């Protein structure tokens, strides 16, 4: 049996695909696996922010097409980069155990404090708004490109610091670059940050991913994505959600910024098997507060 695994071309995307491949091979040593990488539209357009070029769908369109055309059997994604509406023909068939979900700040090589005369680079309004709260008066500017490209721009002196996801740096073996780790209270992470998602066609036998799949990650991802979807939040809309499993419950924290720039943050607990309802009800409560 041969499985073709589709991935974006970046070093981090390939590393994440390799994590999935290693798990499949560990439990199914007879399966032959081929990695197929491709550049997505989102990888090609680097001079505009995500919301200006059509949102998260631009990072999955080519991978979805390859799946539908039968060119690959599964695709591997950072779950946080996937659009809220997923093609019914291409379900998520497995998710990884969650890596550290926190956001971090990285300084240029050789520096050990932020020079506030220069901008802090970050890729989403979610991070921007929360960083401006932590460092009042700082300048935050957009940054695009994969993790290594962003680090290159930082080290060239284009930014005084950049905000990134802990998980990406850890998977790339670049943890030593981390200068400050923000708690999930200081910066609420993007929904599903730190989780790898595997997508396939409906007829795919996902049993080869049974040992890879993590139920805790799945349950919190359902709640987090439900919250964002209820707010109509795409990639750069200022919203975030972070769920933690406590026994049979999920404690879900939602973050939302209304059109006037007012920040709302609320936590709600619900049954772990009712994540969709929990995310939706938290979003409705926050929108009610925003309309009041």
UniProtKB/Swiss-Prot annotation:
Q: Which cofactors must be present for this protein to function?
A: dipyrromethane
| SUPFAM superfamilies associated with the record | Periplasmic binding protein-like II (SSF53850), Porphobilinogen deaminase (hydroxymethylbilane synthase), C-terminal domain (SSF54782)
**What is the catalytic activity of this protein?**
4 porphobilinogen + H2O = hydroxymethylbilane + 4 NH4(+)
Q: Which GO terms describe its cellular component?
A: cytoplasm
Q: What keywords would UniProt list here?
A: Porphyrin biosynthesis, Transferase
E.C. number: 2.5.1.61
Coiled-coil residue windows: none
Q: InterPro entries this protein is in?
A: HemC (IPR000860), Porphobilin_deaminase_N (IPR022417), Porphobilinogen_deaminase_C (IPR022418), Porphobilinogen_deaminase_C_sf (IPR036803)
Stored HAMAP family: Porphobil_deam
Q: What job does this protein perform?
A: Tetrapolymerization of the monopyrrole PBG into the hydroxymethylbilane pre-uroporphyrinogen in several discrete steps.
What is the name attached to this protein's record?
Porphobilinogen deaminase
Q: Which gene encodes it?
A: hemC
